[in-house]
């Protein structure tokens, strides 16, 4: 009986893991270059961790159950609550705290391109500072990771501020901005008519509803933020966002846009919110995050401002493939072929020597013909074949074949490592 993979979950074959490894290693390397340190936490948490402040929509998407001890638990749907739980459980950690993680997360939602019920998610958070410097640093980190993945110039970062949105909406006479937030969060999923009708259904005038629609319709240059307040005084939240963008310019972060439709659905965000998008518009948000200054208070008596973001592997993987970005190979790969009655011990010795010198080495273990071995080596993506035949080995030599050109040369075992190291075919 053939048992199929569960809907919304993925298998990762070796070629898939190449790009996953590239994403993991690039994100980790860039994060550590900013002074971030890696953490990890359980895949299973008490459901109460998410009941506190994540919102009803997220709770409805959890893989939750009652365990054999009668405890209500869930596979983690996101990383931030677990990260905050870890931080608040200890009081000896100096601020600012720069942490990153790369867990698997689970949400029961409808699978689509770039969205699965299980995925890896890179997360980075800064705890302690409540200022624009931290806001700019976390966005700069996000941009640095995308650049490191070979996506420089292919994306734009869109920013907003929930507090500034409140200021603008209050200026329109809207008493309950959070009701509007939930509608704005669905802006890209509904028609104009539905969007305007939804706003009017919660008490907004038709004029204000259409104004909000226009504000959401197009990302603008940051210089236009002041104009959102008309002839009125620009709010402190707007000044803060402008200041954050100014710092980002000094970080060298380009293509930053202001976007009123960026709200971020999670209810714990308190100020800055941001997302990164592929400029072609082919994919949903690449990453997203913001400031959540009040979350730590919900788990403890500690007041710890925080800002962070999350980046799922699924959309990034699709984007890299669409742009033709391939994972780089840091080491040359070699296949050691065994010909005739050459003993396995000789193959093991040659393989060990090459591995000790930093090469990726696969060796023949199936006693196939040389042509079959070479065909397999090419299939595996090896760059060279080291052919160990009886006659060559009697002279303490092997034949090295460049699998991309077919050229080959007899090389002594003593010269094998430097010969491969100086080869320019890679």
Swiss-Prot record:
The keyword Thylakoid does not apply. It is found in: Cytoplasm. This is Histidine--tRNA ligase. Keywords: Aminoacyl-tRNA synthetase, ATP-binding, Cytoplasm, Ligase, Nucleotide-binding, Protein biosynthesis. Belongs to the class-II aminoacyl-tRNA synthetase family. GO terms for biological process: histidyl-tRNA aminoacylation. It comes from Thermoplasma volcanium (strain ATCC 51530 / DSM 4299 / JCM 9571 / NBRC 15438 / GSS1). Gene3D superfamilies: Anticodon-binding domain, Bira Bifunctional Protein, Domain 2. Its main location: cytoplasm. Disulfide bonds: none annotated. It comes from the Archaea. InterPro entries: aa-tRNA-synth_II, aa-tRNA-synth_II/BPL/LPL, Anticodon-bd, Anticodon-bd_dom_sf, His-tRNA-ligase, HisRS-like_core, HisRS/HisZ, HisRS_anticodon. The keyword ATP-binding applies. PROSITE patterns: AA_TRNA_LIGASE_II. Transmembrane segments: none annotated. It catalyses: tRNA(His) + L-histidine + ATP = L-histidyl-tRNA(His) + AMP + diphosphate + H(+). It is an enzyme of class 6 (ligase). Its EC number is 6.1.1.21. GO terms for molecular function: ATP binding; histidine-tRNA ligase activity.
